[in-house]
């Protein structure tokens, strides 16, 4: 399904002749062209007639709707015999023409001056372009992308998720396989070595033969499964119901592998609505949370013991509340078993002081019947949502002693106070020791606490002030990796690996013993590791990690020894690549994913240190490659732009039929949030690809200051002042593009979603119509006081400590927004993340400022992803249609809809009056 107003012919692109730069380029064929036509006529030349006819044909292009203007130009073609007018007419005529030219020149230099003013904050230079046309692209002769194909996942590469399973006796290379092959059992564990050619042994362990089972008269169909570590039992969840982004509830069952029968996890509650459940490392117990309280069932007993009793609306045990799920753990679990199965650590969250935000749902929910007489009222869900500056949930780590059946906590000297503590990571070591990573509320002071659960004692072993270091912050992370002692292999003490700032970049560090605050730095250089480490080969003392070492837009896989020596790539680093990896429990095998820039593929391989060599291709995406050959995918031009000393990554998407002699409108797309990255070399066919391929526009993305993998200096520059420098980077990049011969600087737009929506509005506000004429903001933050505390205060401090920064970052200068030709805002009314309060508050400011140059659309009951009731398709269709209208000049016409005579036509009318007078 296409966009109604688009025109797909290649020749319908803007022509190079069009060089006007003004915001109103479409409705100003311009005084200059009118004056030149008049002068040509005065000289009796027929050239003006040919120019007018040529101009008219050009104005019938895709991005123009200038038929009326074409008619005006035709009106200036003189009679074949030339003019025969009294001398006074010629004098007046000359004066009028002179005034026209003078007016045009004044306007030109005023506009030129406007463009220079906002450049004073940045020195701009551009790097060389690295072009990736796409080997498989159908090029100029290919079909244009259609929006439905992009939205419905036709261009999503096929991928296989492999769940590596640690063998009961330390065996490496075991895979958990679920479904997929009707000739095999539904749930099974396979040894990767059995797949080698010539190996006839069947080492498969069957866990579940069928994809469903009966419990009494009830049919159970698994939504998720978790085998026990000894592979004798399977924990099964059915009837999964979504809660927030990562969390869900469901009914839980225990399935016996030997008898192939199941029973309820809690025999006393068949419809448990359980929020979380997890196995003991010894396979002899399951701990779970229901209605915010924790329980444990120790097998083979059928009895369930309640661990906590006061959980409820304000108290959570073992699971995160909304803000911790969203901003800290990115997961539904806040429960951690120790490696020996003797203790369970869990998060206790007290939300009693956290204010509520009511999310209203207006569309009747057939799965949730209303009470009589209330069916015509909105359903309201109240969320404990701490906005910036509001009271936070109070959290602390508690422990459950499995043998003693006791809950306890540990007081730590010099620990952060309750109301100024965020728990951002928990990692068990050996012998009941656990490492807890904490920060203060503003996330710029790190405190690492080592607790001995057996002795019920703890101490702060490491602390760091990131505000003093570089003015930055600590990002929450759950990648800390425990490295157990092994004296025979040169490790006399327990230790751990995590990412730390080192010389301005994020690098790997090995801390040993556990209470050592001075690590061995494993990596260094002007590049950064990514979510590292991926795994540690304990036998060989090798650390596997992913890094943006070759280029910030790329990812390659490396190893380094625990002493920091012998850093080696395990994939080709000579060509551009974006890789990810999932390693087996012993790091002897890996699922290697190549994600771009070419067609993605996947392999299961043995790692270089493994003497048993293995390689199996499990996905080459031939269907995707074949489809790409048939379509006109845009070419990607990667380059850098240096603004105020910061080298930033840019990608430009050009239509496959790109002609450098034509003039193209440009759409900027951004996200831009702190630590994020949008410019990568992953294979991706998305809305931006559709805009370039189908609509024929150029699409540019620049990762500005604040984004990830370009060093802490660039990332931390935005702290306390979100939006300011990021907007400068968008504006300066747009100005640089506007100077290119193939770009129509009079038709430039910007769009983004979420943080990108905020940045769209902030850029339009800061630009005040000088560079960008149009913008589209989806689910935008408009005032950081309205967003959640943990995310916002990490980058902005609290409103109490930085009131001026919050004032500056809010979208408030509606006079500046009014300088754009037009912008659009869309939002889901059921957004639990970026509340519609953001958009409504901005609309009120726009109304108070009598600003009218915007459109707004609300999607009923949609959350932040905007999916409810066909909304996702509709929001992208709306973006596409609106953009076509913008670049066709529809919004320019609405600015001055009253019919009027142009200056030139009035001049011609005056001449006719004088001639006839």
UniProtKB/Swiss-Prot annotation:
Active-site residues, Swiss-Prot/TrEMBL: 754, 831, 864
Vacuolar side stretches: 112-917
Pfam families: DPPIV_N, Peptidase_S9
Molecular functions (GO terms): aminopeptidase activity; dipeptidyl-peptidase activity; serine-type peptidase activity
TM helices/strands, residue ranges: 91-111
Residues with attached carbohydrate: 350, 465, 813
Region (Disordered): 1-78
EC category: hydrolase
GO biological process, one term: proteolysis
Gene Ontology CC terms: plasma membrane; vacuolar membrane
Enzyme Commission number: 3.4.14.5
Recorded family membership: Belongs to the peptidase S9B family.
PANTHER family, A to Z: DIPEPTIDYL PEPTIDASE 10, ISOFORM B, PROTEASE FAMILY S9B,C DIPEPTIDYL-PEPTIDASE IV-RELATED
Name of the protein described by the UniProt record: Probable dipeptidyl-aminopeptidase B
Species for this entry: Coccidioides posadasii (strain C735)
């Amino acid at each position: 399904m296409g966009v109604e107003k688009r025109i797909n012919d290649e020749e319908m692109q803007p022509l190079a002749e069009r060089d006007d730069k003004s915001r109103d380029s479409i409705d100003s064929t311009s005084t200059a062209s009118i004056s030149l036509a008049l002068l040509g006529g005065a000289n009796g030349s027929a050239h003006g007639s040919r120019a007018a006819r040529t101009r008219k044909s050009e104005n019938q292009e895709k991005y123009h709707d200038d038929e009326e203007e074409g008619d005006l130009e035709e009106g200036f073609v003189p009679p074949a015999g030339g003019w025969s007018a009294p001398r006074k007419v010629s004098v007046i005529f000359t004066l009028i023409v002179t005034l026209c030219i003078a007016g045009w020149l004044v306007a030109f230099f005023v506009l030129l001056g406007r463009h220079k003013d906002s450049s004073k904050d940045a020195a701009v230079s551009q790097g060389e372009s690295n072009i990736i046309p796409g080997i498989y692209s159908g090029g100029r002769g290919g079909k244009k992308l259609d929006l439905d194909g992009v939205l419905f996942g036709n261009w999503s590469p096929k991928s296989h998720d492999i769940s590596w399973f640690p063998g009961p006796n330390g065996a490496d290379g075991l895979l958990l396989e679920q479904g997929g092959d009707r000739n095999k059992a539904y749930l099974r564990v396979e040894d990767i070595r059995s797949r080698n050619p010539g190996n006839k042994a069947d080492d498969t362990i069957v866990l579940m033969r069928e994809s469903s089972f009966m419990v009494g008269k009830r049919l159970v169909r698994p939504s998720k499964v978790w085998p026990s570590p000894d592979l004798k039992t399977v924990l099964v969840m059915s009837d999964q119901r979504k809660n927030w982004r990562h969390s869900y509830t469901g009914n839980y069952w225990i399935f016996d592998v030997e008898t192939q029968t199941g029973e309820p996890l809690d025999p006393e509650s068949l419809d448990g609505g359980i929020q979380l459940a997890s196995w003991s490392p010894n396979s002899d117990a399951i701990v779970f949370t229901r209605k915010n309280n924790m329980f444990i069932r120790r097998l083979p007993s059928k009895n369930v013991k309640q661990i906590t009793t006061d959980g409820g609306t304000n108290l959570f045990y073992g699971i995160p509340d909304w803000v911790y799920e969203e901003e800290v753990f990115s997961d539904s679990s806040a429960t951690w078993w120790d490696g020996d199965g003797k203790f369970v650590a869990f998060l206790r969250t007290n939300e009693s002081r956290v204010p509520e935000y009511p999310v209203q749902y207006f569309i009747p929910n057939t799965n949730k019947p209303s009470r009589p007489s209330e069916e015509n009222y909105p359903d309201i869900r109240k969320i404990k949502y701490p906005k910036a500056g509001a009271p936070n949930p109070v959290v602390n780590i508690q422990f459950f002693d499995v043998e003693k059946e006791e809950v306890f906590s540990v007081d730590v000297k010099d620990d952060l106070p309750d109301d100024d503590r965020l728990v951002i990571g928990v990692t068990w070591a050996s012998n009941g020791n656990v490492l807890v990573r904490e920060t203060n509320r503003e996330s710029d002071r790190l405190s690492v606490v080592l607790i001995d659960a057996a002795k019920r004692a703890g101490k702060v072993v490491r602390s760091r002030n990131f505000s003093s270091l570089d003015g930055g912050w600590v990002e929450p992370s759950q990648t800390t990796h425990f490295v157990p002692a092994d004296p025979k292999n040169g490790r006399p003490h327990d230790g751990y690996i995590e990412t730390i700032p080192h010389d301005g970049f994020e690098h790997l560090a090995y801390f040993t013993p556990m209470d050592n605050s001075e690590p061995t730095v494993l990596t260094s250089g002007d590049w950064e590791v990514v979510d590292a480490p991926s795994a540690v080969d304990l036998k060989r003392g090798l650390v596997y990690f992913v890094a943006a070492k070759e280029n910030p837009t790329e990812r390659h896989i490396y190893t380094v020894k625990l002493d920091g020596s012998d850093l080696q790539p395990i994939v080709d680093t000579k060509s551009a690549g974006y890789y990810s990896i999932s390693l087996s429990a012993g790091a002897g095998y890996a699922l290697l994913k190549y994600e771009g820039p070419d067609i993605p593929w996947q392999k299961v391989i043995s790692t270089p240190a493994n003497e048993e060599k293995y390689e199996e291709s499990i996905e080459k995406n031939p269907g995707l490659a074949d489809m790409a050959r048939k379509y006109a995918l845009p070419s990607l031009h990667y380059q850098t732009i240096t603004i105020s000393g910061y080298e930033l990554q840019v990608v430009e998407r050009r239509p496959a039929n790109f002609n450098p002699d034509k003039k193209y409108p440009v759409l900027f797309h951004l996200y831009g949030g702190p630590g994020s990255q949008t410019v990568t070399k992953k294979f991706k066919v998305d809305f931006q690809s559709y805009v370039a391929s189908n609509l024929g526009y150029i699409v540019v993305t620049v990762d500005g200051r604040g984004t990830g993998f370009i060093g802490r200096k660039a990332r931390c520059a935005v702290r306390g002042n979100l939006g300011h420098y990021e907007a400068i980077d968008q504006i300066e990049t747009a100005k640089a593009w506007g100077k290119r011969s193939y770009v129509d600087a009079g038709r430039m737009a910007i769009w983004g979603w979420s943080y990108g929506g905020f940045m769209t509005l902030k850029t339009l506000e800061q630009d005040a119509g000088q560079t960008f004429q149009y913008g589209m903001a989806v689910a935008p933050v408009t005032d950081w006081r309205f967003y959640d505390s943990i995310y916002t205060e990490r980058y902005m401090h609290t409103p109490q400590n930085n009131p001026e920064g919050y004032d500056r970052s809010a979208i408030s200068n509606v006079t500046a927004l009014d300088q754009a030709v037009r912008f659009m805002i869309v939002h889901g009314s059921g957004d639990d993340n970026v509340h519609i309060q953001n958009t409504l508050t901005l609309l009120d400011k726009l109304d108070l400022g009598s600003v009218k140059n915007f459109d707004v659309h609300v999607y009923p009951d949609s959350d932040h992803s905007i999916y409810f009731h066909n909304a996702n398709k509709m929001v992208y269709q709306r973006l596409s249609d609106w953009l076509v209208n913008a670049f066709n000049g529809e919004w320019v016409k609405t600015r001055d809809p009253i019919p009027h005579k142009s200056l030139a036509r009035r001049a011609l009318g005056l001449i006719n009056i004088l001639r006839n007078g």
